[in-house]
């Protein structure tokens, strides 16, 4: 059994004007999650959803600014040469954004005028597995997980 501590949101906001959602222990790459969150932070919600759908369809790359060693360049004037298409991470973050949008709709906020006020990633648990090999040895097969938190705000 895995014991999890309480994970709080990084910033405190007015609950009447914001909606939030959190995904815990999502089995995606921390580096990919960080780069996607950095790309969509501050965007309008509809733009961010369209951006992630384009990443999933491999029409638009995510710019890799920190984790960019040995990352190929992408064509087009993007403002940064290195980029990739992290499809698995984009699907997971898109799902969390849709949950946050549903929470905003439930609260009565105007879903057409929402922007991402805060989105961040935290390191989750590491799922440790071992693959048996010959002569009594074992190879570790660790899976990293990520916590993602999103706060949406209504703008005017």
Swiss-Prot record:
One of its GO terms (biological process) is cytoplasmic translation. GO terms for cellular component: cytosolic large ribosomal subunit. Keywords: Ribonucleoprotein, Ribosomal protein, RNA-binding, rRNA-binding. The keyword DNA-binding does not apply. The keyword Ribonucleoprotein applies. Pfam families: Ribosomal_L22. GO terms for molecular function: rRNA binding; structural constituent of ribosome. HAMAP family: Ribosomal_uL22_A. This protein binds specifically to 23S rRNA. It makes multiple contacts with different domains of the 23S rRNA in the assembled 50S subunit and ribosome. Part of the 50S ribosomal subunit. Belongs to the universal ribosomal protein uL22 family. This is Large ribosomal subunit protein uL22.
């Amino acid at each position: 059994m895995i014991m999890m501590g309480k994970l709080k949101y990084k910033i405190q906001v007015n609950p009447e004007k914001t909606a939030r959602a959190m995904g815990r222990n999502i089995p995606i790459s921390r580096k990919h999650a960080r780069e996607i969150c950095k790309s969509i932070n501050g965007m309008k919600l509809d733009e961010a959803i369209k951006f992630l759908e384009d990443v999933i369809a491999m029409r638009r790359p995510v710019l890799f600014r920190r984790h960019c060693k040995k990352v190929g360049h992408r064509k087009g004037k993007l403002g940064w040469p290195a980029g990739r298409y992290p499809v698995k991470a984009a699907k997971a973050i898109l799902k969390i954004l849709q949950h946050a949008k549903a929470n905003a709709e439930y609260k009565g906020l105007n879903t057409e005028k929402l922007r991402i006020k805060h989105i961040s990633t935290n390191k989750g648990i590491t799922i440790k597995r071992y693959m048996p090999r010959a002569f009594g040895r074992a190879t570790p097969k660790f899976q990293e997980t990520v916590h993602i938190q999103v706060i949406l705000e209504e703008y005017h």
